[in-house]
Regions:
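Active-site-proximal, structured, solvent-exposed surfaces of multi-pass membrane proteins
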Residues: 466-596
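Extracytoplasmic
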Residues: 9, 97, 260-512, 516-520, ...
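Membrane-embedded transmembrane-helix bundle of lipid-linked glycan/lipid transferases
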Residues: 1-283, 288-301, 387-390, 406-408, ...
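Short solvent-exposed coil/turn linkers within tandem alpha-helical repeat scaffolds
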Residues: 651-660, 688-697, 725-739
């Protein structure tokens, strides 16, 4: 809760730095309670409910960003204090990347100052560059390894304006609107702090619309805009307040009214605070929790634990209680420290959906199946998960009826199941030889592999990750991650392994054969006893041992050391005594003159780029659905030629969105109905490749076969229909594919009879 307690203080300091006289900064500390106790959301960040839900790091960064925005306003005028500003911004960024953007973006306001453009530009560059250097030990490795993370840039679907403007902010919203109008209509030096805050709101709104295009969740920017609205309302209140004799008295009355309003708006926060901070031990369910964790106790070396996702676990203190199983039981679960962003998260959430009545498909852009523990079992085997905790009747019934599982603890409504006949190894030789797949989107294709039951025993690697000198190790290749050659690996291999947090060692009787390691791949894993570590599906490691003993060690690599070096440079800059007038106005004069001459062009170009990019992002967010619906209405009227341009436009604008997938599918469907099977074939294939997890995929595979049949490519058509029946046996389109195969066999029989 440090961030929550910090915000009133940083608000006070920020308002003082903005030039507001007493009692406005003190009133700002009280007004910050309007934001902190906002119960309108519990996951956007910054407010107390979000902190209680686990967004404590964002809360800390939020307070530091507020402080930075205020101090920047004061210090940029003198050109001094850049070291402490850089440190504050770096701490905000290390707490949360969105906090860094929230703090840094308002600084663009000072680049509109005609007289001080060059000086302000140099000052901002000095502060921001130093902050980036200070963050280097974390930032450089993050950027370099971002390809091994999972983006959670989901788009928030607002259902009401109350979400953006909850009840607790109603009194400040009209005040902020009036102040915004005032500072725009009456620009003056006295209104400059208000214009700065208003600009900060605008630039934060722009960041909101551009966030998803750079892989950030847009909703994280809303809290900062809400807080800035409070500051803008304070700007209006400050105008008459500082002119009133004994201003402390009306300020005290306003503070009391604010506290009363906050108190009247609070409902669940106090009980949530008590629930969170009394701990697991004070809950009535704690003895049950102890029995479950004792039944699962082991060590890191042991196979993993899986658990059904369910809100019913809230009775223990949190529905995410089992993320603490490594601490409670000593054994690993499917998740690591970071739940949503590691490279394995799309696979974990897919698997969780298979073994949970209420799965949580939080990673955007992926398909999540219905509960099916039978299909989940081979995927649990893949992750070396031997024990599973279940709570809902449907999942328990499925596991009870599955001979591969045995119930080992019955503690209604909880039950623990033990996987029988699992070898329990993290290192294993796969049953089939690995296949090198030609792919430009390995994450998507590896996920397609993971969702295909028939492919799970054949590990795949991305061709572009295999150096030319190593390709002889992968004689089998494929262009599809799901249609793979199955070449069995002969030989019985004995493997002894030892795992620790930063090291994996194993001894094998089968050097030269591929060894599949059920631990997440990351570039920091270095190997001894093999030439290199390969990224293999789903996101595991694969090695070809050169000798019986192999050791993999997680250690720093070059980019990590470069990041540490950058941070040391940043620290040196901050700790080195400043020379007089180091970044003051007028140095260097020649550069300033050139920059000031270029200012109109630079500012106009930057504004145009930002506005065009934002307009494009808004268009991509808003337009695909209505454009698609125009095409759909034409499609319903069988006006296929008129529908196709709308579908194409929805596909181009929509990116990886659902309207784009629908546009792709119905464009192909329109072409097929127009008697153009060749063009339709390419359209259906485009959907399966671009949107491999979409609900239209199975139907598209079926129509691929249909197009091939119409084109007379009967052998390929049979293969396509057969793929549907094997890969999606429970789907209704598998039944239609079976009918097509029967028709093709009958036609072939007739041709043979006539021949």
């Amino acid at each position: 809760m440090v961030g929550s307690f910090l915000l009133p203080l940083t608000t006070t300091l920020a308002l003082r730095a903005l030039g507001y006289a007493f009692p406005v900064p003190a009133l700002g500390a009280v007004a910050s309670l309007l934001f902190l106790f906002n119960e309108g959301n519990s996951m956007w960040g910054g407010n107390i409910p979000s902190t209680l839900a686990g967004e404590f790091s964002h809360s800390l960064g939020f307070g530091l960003a507020v402080l930075f925005v205020g101090l920047l306003y004061r210090r940029i005028e003198s050109g001094r204090g850049w070291r402490s500003l850089a440190a504050i911004l770096a701490l905000a960024g290390l707490s949360h990347p969105v906090a860094f953007i929230n703090g840094a973006a308002p600084g663009l306001f000072f680049l509109f100052d005609r007289q001080r453009f060059a000086a302000n530009l140099r000052y901002l560059a000095t502060v921001y560059l130093t902050a980036v250097l200070l963050m280097g030990f974390w930032l450089l490795p993050l950027v370099a390894k971002l390809g091994y993370a999972t983006s959670i840039n989901w788009t928030w679907n607002f259902t009401s304006w109350h979400e953006l403007l909850p009840r607790i902010l109603w009194p400040v919203a009209p005040l902020a609107a009036l102040d915004a109008l005032w500072v725009v209509v009456r620009p003056s030096p006295a209104n400059r702090p208000g214009r700065y805050v208003l600009f900060s709101i605008v630039i934060t709104a722009i960041a909101f619309y551009d966030a998803t295009s750079v892989g950030l969740p847009e909703i994280r920017f809303v809290p900062f805009a809400q807080f800035l609205v409070i500051l803008l309302a304070l700007d209006l209140v400050a105008r008459p307040l500082v002119r009133v004799p004994a201003a402390a008295l009306p300020a005290l009355a306003l503070a009391a009214a604010t506290v009363a309003w906050v108190q009247s708006s609070i409902t669940y926060v106090p009980s949530w605070i008590k629930w969170n901070y009394e701990g697991f031990e004070r809950k009535d369910t704690y003895p049950t929790l102890q029995r479950i964790t004792e039944a699962l106790r082991g060590k890191l070396q042991d196979p993993r634990i899986a658990y059904e996702n369910s809100p019913l676990y809230e009775r223990f203190g949190s529905m995410r209680v089992w993320e603490g199983l490594p601490r409670f039981s000593g054994r690993a679960t499917l998740e690591g420290l970071l739940l949503q962003t590691p490279v394995t998260s799309p696979f974990i959430y897919y698997l969780q959906s298979l073994i949970s009545t209420q799965g949580t498909g939080v990673i955007p852009g992926y398909f999540y199946p219905s509960v099916d523990p039978k299909r989940g079992t081979p995927r649990l085997d893949l992750f070396n998960a031997r024990d599973m905790l279940a709570i809902t009747p449907g999942v328990k019934k499925a596991l009870d009826e599955d001979p591969r599982w045995q119930r080992t603890l019955d503690l209604p409504p909880y039950a623990i199941y033990h996987r029988k006949d699992l070898d329990g190894h993290y290192v294993r030789v796969p049953h089939y030889r690995p296949v090198m797949v030609e792919t430009s989107r390995w994450k998507r294709d590896f996920h397609r592999w993971f969702t295909t039951d028939a492919a799970l025993e054949v590990p795949i690697v991305a061709a572009d990750s295999v150096p030319a000198a190593e390709r002889t190790r992968f004689p089998l290749t494929s262009r599809s991650p799901t249609e793979l050659p199955h070449v069995r690996l002969d030989g019985h291999c004995d493997i002894e392994e030892h795992l620790s947090h930063l090291q994996i060692e194993f001894t094998t009787t089968c050097p030269g054969l591929p060894h599949w390691i059920a631990v997440s791949y990351f570039p920091n894993w270095q190997v001894e006893g093999a030439s290199r570590v390969y990224l293999a599906s789903p996101a595991f490691m694969l090695v070809f041992p050169d000798r019986p003993h192999v050791r993999l060690t997680y250690r720093r690599i070059t980019v990590d050391w470069l990041g540490i070096g950058a941070s040391l440079v940043g620290l040196a800059l901050c700790l080195t005594p400043a020379r007089r007038r180091q970044v003051e106005v007028g140095e260097p004069a020649a550069l300033d003159r050139r920059l000031n001459a270029l200012r109109p062009y630079l500012v106009v170009a930057a504004v145009l780029v930002v506005l065009l990019a934002t307009a494009g992002n808004v268009a991509r967010a808003v337009l695909p659905r209505p454009i698609y619906m125009r095409g759909w209405r034409a499609f319903e009227k069988q006006e296929y030629a008129r529908a196709i341009p709308y579908f194409e436009m929805a596909t181009r604008l929509g990116g990886n969105s659902y309207p784009a997938a629908e546009g792709t599918f119905f464009r192909a469907a329109s072409l097929l109905r127009m008697g153009k099977p060749a063009a339709a074939l390419e359209g259906y294939r485009a959907l399966t490749e671009r949107f491999p997890d979409n609900v239209w995929v199975v139907e598209s595979y079926y129509h691929v076969g249909l197009c091939l049949r119409q084109l007379g490519r009967l052998r390929e058509a049979k293969a396509a229909f057969r793929y549907v029946t094997l890969s999606y046996p429970e789907n209704r389109w598998a039944g239609f594919a079976t009918d097509q195969l029967k028709q093709l066999r009958e036609e072939a029989r007739v041709r043979r009879t006539r021949g």
